[in-house]
Swiss-Prot record:
Pfam families with a match to the protein in the record: Ribosomal_L22 (PF00237)
Taxonomic path: Archaea, Thermoproteota, Thermoprotei, Thermoproteales, Thermoproteaceae
Biological process according to GO: cytoplasmic translation
Record InterPro entries: Ribosomal_uL22, Ribosomal_uL22_euk/arc, Ribosomal_uL22_sf
Listed GO CC annotations: cytosolic large ribosomal subunit
Taxonomic superkingdom: Archaea
Protein's name in the database: Large ribosomal subunit protein uL22
Family: Belongs to the universal ribosomal protein uL22 family.
PANTHER family: 60S RIBOSOMAL PROTEIN L17
Gene, per the UniProt record: rpl22
Species this chain originates from: Pyrobaculum islandicum (strain DSM 4184 / JCM 9189 / GEO3)
Amino acid sequence: MPQHQNYSLSEEDVIQLVFRKYGVKITSEQIVRAYAPEQKMSWKKSVEVARFIKGMTLRQAKSWLEDVVKMKRPIPIKTFKKKQAHHAVPWSGWPVAKWPVKVAKRFLDLLENLENNAKFRGLDVERVVIVHAAAHKGYRIPNIMPRAFGRATRFDEQTVNVEVIAAELPKEVVPKRYKLNLVKR
């Protein structure tokens, strides 16, 4: 397995991203990263979870994902929703929602790592906001499934490279509550 850490955003890119989105200037000492290479989980579900936690504080993301593991709150599915069951989700604007438990557990481990990195750097964990989260396809592990009459079918096991970048922001721009479209039908 490759041990290199390929972040898709440099520190300058993160500083510009925070300035464009929140209107504050930060330094490179206020940025923390966590990277989990070659995780054996669904890439499509990882993309949806990464998209969902972007913009949340670290505490908000951890509490939401803990509820996903307990099957109390779902993750909205925005992109990969064709031929999916459209459950009667009680929130408008979410035609499809899922409970990706395995992916949520892996993201919780990654957010725990991110929180420890923030504490190590001396940042206030209550003001750490996730500014970038991404899931990229990793390498595929080839496998063979034996079939009847001496045949075999090849199938590949997918891996995912997950990265989360967060920044410590001033108190006035930290989101108090994550805004969701939670209007009851």
